């Protein structure tokens, strides 16, 4: 079962030149006897229904501020998720507790769209019991629109943040690696148009 509730507030200032809206969401989800991937003694993995439960709870705040052709979107998400079995609760892996996002858009209708974005991910628990490192990913996009066609360019992760630059993706030797969880981008900077 689950429950979510959200609240919205919208207003404007300076004779309507500045718009402001905020959305606040709260959520809770509970799964009894969930299906989880578990390692076996022979080094393989198996999907098993556990006898406990998993739950997630948290909140998300989204703010939008507009001024003429500019729009700023700010967001924060808090997620607390864990699995409880035999009276012991453990934090779920690969789920950052804190996530921030920000997007600044400039848009002239039917002419231009330009956007700059940044996303922050807090440290998260990994399958080997260690914590991953925090990281930020940034992007930029631009689109010029004409009557019959448009040109578009997208620069993803232009700061070239890659897990291999700030953390390992395997331990042991290259001939006998033990692979770690992938929790951050591996591709680095990507451009498409």
Give the positions of each predicted feature:
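Gram-negative outer-membrane beta-barrel transporters
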Residues: 9, 13-35, 39-126
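Hydrophobic, lipid-facing positions within transmembrane beta-strands of outer-membrane proteins
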Residues: 1-5, 57-61, 98-102, 136-140, ...
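C-terminal beta-signal and adjacent terminal beta-strands/loops
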Residues: 32, 144-193
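Composition- and surface-driven signal marking solvent-exposed, interaction-prone regions
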Residues: 19-23, 130, 155-156, 167
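Solvent-exposed loop/turn segments connecting transmembrane beta-strands
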Residues: 127-133
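Active-site lining segments that contact anionic ligands and/or coordinate catalytic metals
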Residues: 2-4, 19-21, 111, 135-137, ...
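Short intrinsically disordered, low-complexity coil segments enriched in acidic
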Residues: 1-7, 178-181
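Aromatic-acidic/polar surface patches that form glycan- and anion
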Residues: 52, 93, 131, 184-185
